[in-house]
């Protein structure tokens, strides 16, 4: 799957670049234990570190980075970023901007006391024909002080435009620096095709396979990882 990113030539050596999600896993995932003791069981259980679907979701697609350090203090957002001018003109020079909370009126997202941000993106994203881009908050990252909203962009057709990333600011007590490179969105290419839903009874050979797999899952660890997990580059 080829994804083409473009930016003004004056910014090509200035901007942080999108990275494959597999290269942007958080440090806490590496540091977390593989097992944890459960007093009620009197023993240990395997943690999320041993859950391939949890990790593979975090490794899928690519991450879009925050363009510059942003200092947050007392509800104010500040940055010191000398972005060069470009010959293209009419492009924002700020790593983030703001939405009005009223733009979410009537939805469960609306909260007049909660800031709505827009993380500005400086890279166009072009996908191969027939593919759209599912944009989500970085998967399994509740540790971030914001929540990026989900969107779907037909990036095979919109490859010459900039996709920005609206988000809700979740932590009013946060004080510190959102570092350049912080993942502000996870992007997953999806093929644009109609779904065909089929419903069948679990019987005969499928019922036998179901029973065999259920027994295997109950008798040994790592069955999914060893027998069913697909290889990923």
Please place each PLM-identified region on the residue numbering.
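Non-catalytic terminal segments and appended small domains
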Residues: 1-162, 168-233
């Amino acid at each position: 799957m080829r994804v083409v990113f473009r930016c003004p030539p004056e910014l090509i050596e200035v901007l942080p670049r999108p990275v494959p999600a597999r290269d942007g896993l958080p440090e806490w995932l590496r540091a977390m234990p593989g097992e944890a003791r459960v007093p009620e069981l009197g023993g240990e259980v395997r943690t999320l570190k041993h859950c391939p679907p949890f990790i593979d979701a975090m490794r899928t697609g690519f991450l879009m980075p925050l363009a510059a350090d942003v200092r947050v203090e007392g509800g104010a957002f500040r940055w010191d970023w000398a972005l060069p001018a470009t010959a293209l003109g009419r492009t924002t020079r700020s790593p983030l901007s703001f939405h009005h909370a009223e733009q979410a009126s009537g939805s469960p997202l609306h909260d007049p006391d909660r800031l709505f941000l827009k993380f500005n993106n400086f890279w166009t994203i072009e996908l191969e024909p027939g593919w759209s881009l599912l944009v989500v908050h970085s998967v399994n990252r509740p540790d971030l002080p914001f929540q990026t909203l989900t969107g779907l962009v037909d990036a095979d057709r919109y490859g010459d435009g900039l996709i920005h990333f609206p988000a809700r600011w979740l932590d009013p007590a946060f004080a510190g620096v959102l570092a350049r490179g912080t993942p502000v969105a996870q992007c997953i290419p999806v093929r644009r095709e109609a779904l065909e839903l089929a419903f069948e009874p679990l019987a005969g050979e499928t019922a036998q396979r179901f029973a065999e797999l259920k027994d295997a899952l109950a008798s040994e660890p790592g069955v999914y990882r060893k027998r069913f997990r697909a290889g990923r580059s």
